[in-house]
Amino acid sequence: MPELPEVETLKNSLKDKLIGLIIENVELKRDNLRYKLSPLLATETLNTNILDVRRRAKYLIIDFNNDYSLIVHLGMSGRFTLQSANYKTQKHDHVIFDLSNGEKLIFNDTRRFGMIYSFKTDLLEKEFLNDLGIEPFSDLLTLEYLKDKLQTKKIPIKNLIMDNRVIVGVGNIYASESLHLARIHPDKSGNNLRDDEIENLIKAIRDVLTKAITAGGTTLKDFVNGDNKPGYFTKQLKVYGREGQSCLSCSSTIIKIKHSGRSTFYCKTCQYS
């Protein structure tokens, strides 16, 4: 599932190309997605001018001049790409936006777990994104904030940093990578972390996410940016997906365990605490 770096990469690849364009036609191809397409999606975006392209958590948001916004979540396999005027529709294309420069903006989702909605811009934070925690790069993510969130939690720290009500955008890949960089065992209870460990973890999360964004995200199978290019952070993964291989820091064997049904990868030597 695309995480914060992938959505940030998608935003960066689309923003300068979309701002100022007009949506001249909207085609809804099918409605049998997990989150069904609303007919209002077409009427609330048609003939609008694109003002901004931004990200909140794992959501891509496109703001229009009619006080509506488009909210896109890629789900497991979603793609949101720019295509040329002579693009041939593909099997899993669900929404096609014809743009005023002749290009097409395509929402494609093979597994159909993604979502694409239109919503009043001024109500987004109050009614749609209201349960989300703070951004990893926000100045609000401090020792005091995270310590307060962790002090009563007796569940594994990996689960806690993946909780979007606490910190947004840190999915399975980057949680494993961040904990390895911070040298914290993924099973350690949140309320048992020392202050220095919390500070190291905040820094590690930011460092890992920054490197992933610079590399264009992580493509394990489906992810591409708006220009149809994959992410290359896969080549920099230290533990994720490396079960049985040697740790790149100490040469111990990478171990795989399960947390809430998700695979977790760690090094028992580096992550002893």
From Swiss-Prot:
A zinc finger (FPG-type) spans 238-272. The active site is at P2, E3, K58, R262. One of its GO terms (biological process) is base-excision repair. Pfam families: Fapy_DNA_glyco, H2TH, zf-FPG_IleRS. It catalyses: Hydrolysis of DNA containing ring-opened 7-methylguanine residues, releasing 2,6-diamino-4-hydroxy-5-(N-methyl)formamidopyrimidine; 2'-deoxyribonucleotide-(2'-deoxyribose 5'-phosphate)-2'-deoxyribonucleotide-DNA = a 3'-end 2'-deoxyribonucleotide-(2,3-dehydro-2,3-deoxyribose 5'-phosphate)-DNA + a 5'-end 5'-phospho-2'-deoxyribonucleoside-DNA + H(+). Keywords: DNA damage, DNA repair, DNA-binding, Glycosidase, Hydrolase, Lyase, Metal-binding, Multifunctional enzyme, Zinc, Zinc-finger. Binds 1 zinc ion per subunit. Involved in base excision repair of DNA damaged by oxidation or by mutagenic agents. Acts as a DNA glycosylase that recognizes and removes damaged bases. Has a preference for oxidized purines, such as 7,8-dihydro-8-oxoguanine (8-oxoG). Has AP (apurinic/apyrimidinic) lyase activity and introduces nicks in the DNA strand. Cleaves the DNA backbone by beta-delta elimination to generate a single-strand break at the site of the removed base with both 3'- and 5'-phosphates. HAMAP family: Fapy_DNA_glycosyl. This is Formamidopyrimidine-DNA glycosylase. It comes from Rickettsia conorii (strain ATCC VR-613 / Malish 7).
